[in-house]
Amino acid sequence: MQSPHISVLLDEVLDAFHGLSGTFIDCTLGYGGHSGALLEQNKNLRLIACDKDDEAIEFSKKRLENFGDRVKIYKSDFSQLIKVLSTDELKNVRGILADIGVSSLQLDKNERGFSINSDTLDMRMDRACEFSAADVINSYSQQNLAEIFSKYGELSNAKALAAKIVSARNLKKITSAKELASIIGTGRVNGRSVSPAILAFQAIRVEVNDELGELNRLLESIKSANLKECKVAIISFHSLEDRIVKNTFKSWAQSCICPPNAMRCKCGNDHAIGKILTKKAIVASQKEIAANPRSSSAKMRVFEIKGR
């Protein structure tokens, strides 16, 4: 079944989980590209997966139906999936993958409102939720807009952009992504490779879907699950996400948690739950980037949980 979305770092994901048996959790099922390839590669693997996009779930159910009872799919926020699994399900988990990105289909579909060319202003991953990008743009204070542009878009002119948006919406409600992009400006500035509109849209999307909160909650739920002999791979697409993953994995590998200025260890020096398998983030090859330019910002980090 042909997927409308190209899975990033697919070969690298297959390498990371080669020879895996037991249960595999795909926290971001999407259109089933990673999961389908892993099930095909690893014949003794069972899949538990989730997504919150109804369209993606329905597509993946059909795509993966030939794997029969090896597949179980939930509609859920990825941060909640591990919490709802039974003890029996968790004890056999040997791999976890989360691809923290927007699918190509979501970006390209006009009605989803993710693109700067969209006629809508939506950006919801889960369309059952009421809160959308239009609510952020038309109801947030100027200060709050500036804060999310600065924090999530890392825009140096966040205050100026927020002021432009508030001035525009005072004349009339902003209802489309195209309109918002024209207000912000789509030209590249200060030598940056992307326009302020792209970065601002990223910030709005992160806010609408609480993406960083979701990622933090997912990582905490993984640690709290007391897993053993389990590989965890996280694919992220911008520096804020990658920083969270990098720092979390570093903390998981830290045996001593005494203060840096402590003269001697008093914590027992046994707090590490595993080891980092990727000293540097894995990135897409030039061949993959040529075939799928959206993969250029993807970074994957892998951690092996040994348990304590």
Curated annotation (Swiss-Prot):
Belongs to the methyltransferase superfamily. RsmH family. One of its GO terms (cellular component) is cytoplasm. One of its GO terms (biological process) is rRNA base methylation. It catalyses: cytidine(1402) in 16S rRNA + S-adenosyl-L-methionine = N(4)-methylcytidine(1402) in 16S rRNA + S-adenosyl-L-homocysteine + H(+). It is found in: Cytoplasm. The keyword Nucleotidyltransferase does not apply. CDD domains: AdoMet_MTases. It comes from Campylobacter curvus (strain 525.92). It comes from the Bacteria. It holds the Pfam family Methyltransf_5. It is an enzyme of class 2 (transferase). This is Ribosomal RNA small subunit methyltransferase H. Specifically methylates the N4 position of cytidine in position 1402 (C1402) of 16S rRNA. Keywords: Cytoplasm, Methyltransferase, rRNA processing, S-adenosyl-L-methionine, Transferase. S-adenosyl-L-methionine binds at residues 32-34, 51, 78, 99, 106. Its EC number is 2.1.1.199. One of its GO terms (molecular function) is rRNA (cytosine-N4-)-methyltransferase activity.
